[in-house]
A protein has these predicted regions:
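Conserved ABC ATPase "signature" region
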Residues: 103, 110-128, 179-180
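Conserved ABC ATPase signature
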Residues: 132-136, 140
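A short, proline-enriched helix->beta-strand linker immediately N-terminal to the Walker B motif
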Residues: 151-155
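Helix-to-loop junction immediately C-terminal to a conserved catalytic motif
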Residues: 55
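Conserved structural motif at the start of ABC-family nucleotide-binding domains
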Residues: 7, 24-26
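Conserved ABC transporter NBD signature motif
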Residues: 63-75
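The feature captures the beta-strand-to-loop junction immediately N-terminal to the Walker
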Residues: 40-42
Length: 262
């Protein structure tokens, strides 16, 4: 039985500056239900713009993006995004930040309280519910952003380099925690892992988190190659790095990123 496609990008193109700057062109990508796809590419090639288009935050000049059979025109309640720079509201506590999206979605007050408690604890922030962002480390702030997204119990999780600004130790801890959540707990009320699209500059991170890696060219971005990560799950970052396939996959990604394209 074929696995359903949850998110489909069809001949997507995006320009800025009145059409003078083409960010990406003719992109086609299909992401299956419960699949984790990591996107690698040079700086400025449009990775973040593509992710924002998947969420309905920016429009396309050509092509379309389809989620569950419907064209994406605006943000959807079953899609959640985690931003690179946390995106927290500094005047709100941890609890209030995590609850914010649920309140906008009109979730019942009791359900909001239950979900906030569940996901704050899941990301390791129990005891910090009343804390404000300025009192938290970068890693803890990103945990808040992750809890806020997970609390929506989304079908699709969009991650825009969420660990890129963190130190190496904190980054690996959060990578392992994300793997654990997706592989064992799930984000839809514990029923199943969400579909995930994860933007990163780190080859190691892409291999650790992804079922497939999409390598983009320099701007205007096109898909150079899609690589299957044939390392079994469940995984940890350490187990991936120690796997015999890791070096080959890393070198293959490096070669693609280093090659100059027309």
């Amino acid at each position: 039985m074929a696995v359903a496609e949850r998110l489909v990008v069809e001949r997507a193109s995006k320009t800025f500056s009145g059409g003078e700057l083409t960010v990406f062109a003719d992109l086609d990508l299909a992401v299956r239900d419960q699949e984790s796809v990591c996107v690698l590419g040079p700086s400025g090639c449009g990775k973040t713009t593509l992710l924002r288009a998947m969420h309905g935050l920016v429009g396309l000049d050509e092509g379309r993006i389809v989620v569950d059979g419907s064209v994406v025109l605006r943000p959807r309640s079953n899609v959640a995004m985690v931003f690179q720079h946390f995106g927290l509201m500094p005047w709100k506590s941890v609890t209030a930040n995590v609850a914010y999206g649920l309140e906008l979605a009109g979730v019942a007050r009791q359900e909001i309280a239950e979900r906030v408690t569940r996901y704050v604890e899941l990301v390791g922030l129990k005891g910090f519910e009343r804390s404000y962002p300025h009192t938290l480390s970068g890693g803890m702030q990103q945990r808040v952003g992750l809890a806020r997204a997970l609390a929506m119990e989304p079908d699709i999780l969009l991650m825009d380099e969420p660990f890129g600004s963190l130190d190496a130790q904190t980054r690996e801890i959060l990578q392992d925690e994300l793997l654990s959540i997706l592989q064992t707990t799930g984000v839809r009320g514990g029923r199943a892992p969400a579909t995930m699209v994860f933007i990163t500059h780190s080859i190691e991170e892409a291999i650790a988190l992804g079922d497939r890696i999409v390598v983009l060219s320099a701007r205007p971005a096109r898909i150079r190659e899609t690589i299957s990560v044939d390392i079994p799950r469940p995984r940890t970052v350490a187990s991936v790095v120690a796997h015999p396939r890791f070096v080959e996959l890393r070198d293959r990604c490096w070669r693609l990123l280093r090659e100059r394209t027309a």
